[in-house]
């Protein structure tokens, strides 16, 4: 359906919703690369004006693409709850999510009444402060071996990657993270090698570490989900099943992923937990996403990268995950060119994920050839912590020596918790107090004494081979 707007004597015509949404998006290198971005700021403003007048039911009447992701989104929509808002426009949805009463309405059922396309449309007519204000009161609480997402909780994934998957190196980095109070979200390793044997070894090592120190958290080895399932069949203790996902069927095919395969993986991991101790909930999936991933595998189908990202959240929502995070800035300047685009994408992704009911975290990061620096990550970290982000990354020294990109460090996460008055997951914080790493809700002197504290802590896990 065509839509047109006349702005200062110039008429802009948009052939369909897909084109309208792409033109209304904030500047993104990926959209420019795909040839779908607005050609001028005036066209962008005109598109935003037209998009604000689109009724929400149009996103069901005019699907952007016909594929299995669209089918999943439509079938999982709470149509009864949607009936109450179907005639609202995108602009009216923006106004609704910014009201003080919205969080209560959202909790009572509106979070199931929105499709990713609706949420993505609202995001592109919101300011940075709007995105933060709307997301902050929305909480998505999940349980695996601890409880994530409660009000005031800022979780941290410990990411102890190693360029050769050296077990001692991985565990030493993980212990370093624990001493900073990090690791409540997950101790998650990206393996340098994707062999079954390597994944099995890493799964056992992380499990043994968690058992040895008695920390209430979960581990994950971020290999392809099929590799993790093969490791599970060989006896590996899989706490969380990880997979990168996209917002179109073609993108997921490029990742070697099917919706049926994810469903079968979920059931396999849940079944494996029946015979293991320590689990307090059934949220066992961990998904990563990121603006630009669909374009990177030529699977976007003409849809802009913000909308593709939101649709990936539609996939994630169907599997009731424990964690979801956008790796904002990871795939480079071809998709997010600079600090401005990275910061905007991080706030958009967090808002969209939260509005769709996800336990949303952000890997606040950049590659070494993009126009950004550690001030970028500092600023976005503070903004997201203020906006109620579920979790962020903890990377030793901010520099991932295996993936070769820059993220947030253990000390960054600890510092921003203190700055905004956030805390770890409750079970994890209790363990921190018991071990002396925390004292009165803050890092203790024991944790601040550097190598001596690390040496003292590792004495309890000598049997792991450190």
What do the predicted segments below correspond to?
Residues 1-171, 179, 184-466:
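Anaerobic metallocofactor- and corrinoid-dependent redox/one-carbon enzyme cores
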């Amino acid at each position: 359906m065509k839509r047109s707007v006349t702005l200062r004597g110039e008429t802009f015509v948009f052939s369909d919703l897909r084109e309208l949404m792409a033109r209304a998006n904030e500047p993104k290198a990926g959209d420019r690369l795909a040839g779908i971005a607005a050609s001028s700021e005036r066209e962008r403003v005109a598109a935003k004006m037209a998009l604000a007048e689109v009724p929400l039911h149009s996103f069901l009447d005019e699907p952007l693409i016909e594929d299995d992701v669209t089918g999943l989104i439509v079938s999982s929509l709470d149509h009864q709850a949607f009936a109450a808002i179907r005639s609202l426009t995108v602009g009216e949805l923006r106004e609704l999510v910014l009201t003080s009463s919205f969080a209560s309405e959202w909790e009572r059922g509106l979070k199931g009444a929105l499709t990713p396309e609706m949420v993505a449309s609202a995001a592109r007519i919101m300011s940075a402060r709007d995105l933060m204000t709307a997301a902050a009161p929305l909480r998505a609480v999940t349980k695996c071996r601890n409880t994530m997402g409660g009000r005031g909780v800022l979780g941290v994934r410990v990411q102890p990657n190693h360029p050769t998957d050296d077990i001692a190196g991985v565990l030493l980095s993980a212990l370093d993270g624990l001493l900073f109070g990090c690791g409540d979200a997950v101790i998650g390793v990206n393996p340098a090698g994707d062999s079954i044997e390597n994944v099995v070894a890493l799964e056992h090592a992380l499990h043994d570490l968690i058992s040895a120190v008695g920390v209430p958290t979960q581990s994950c080895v971020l290999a392809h989900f099929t590799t993790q399932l093969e490791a599970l069949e060989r006896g590996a203790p899989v706490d969380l099943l990880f997979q990168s996902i996209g917002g179109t069927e073609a993108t997921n095919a490029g990742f070697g992923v099917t919706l049926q395969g994810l469903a079968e993986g979920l059931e396999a991991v849940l079944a494996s937990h029946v015979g293991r101790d320590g689990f307090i909930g059934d949220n066992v999936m961990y998904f990563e996403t990121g603006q630009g991933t669909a374009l990177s595998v030529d699977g976007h189908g003409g849809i802009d990268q913000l909308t593709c990202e939101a649709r990936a959240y539609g996939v994630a929502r169907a599997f009731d995950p424990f964690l979801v995070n956008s790796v904002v800035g990871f795939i480079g300047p071809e998709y997010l060119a600079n600090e401005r685009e990275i910061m905007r994408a991080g706030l958009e992704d967090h808002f969209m994920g939260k509005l769709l009911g996800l336990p949303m975290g952000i890997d606040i990061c950049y590659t070494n050839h993009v126009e950004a620096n550690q001030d970028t990550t500092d600023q976005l970290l503070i903004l997201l912590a203020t906006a109620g982000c579920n979790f962020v990354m903890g990377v030793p020294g901010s520099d991932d020596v295996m993936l070769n990109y820059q993220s947030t460090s253990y000390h960054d996460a600890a510092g921003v918790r203190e700055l905004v008055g956030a805390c770890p997951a409750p079970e994890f914080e209790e363990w921190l107090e018991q071990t002396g790493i925390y004292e009165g809700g803050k890092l203790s002197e024991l944790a601040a004494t550097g190598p001596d504290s690390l040496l003292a802590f590792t004495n309890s896990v000598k049997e792991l081979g450190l």
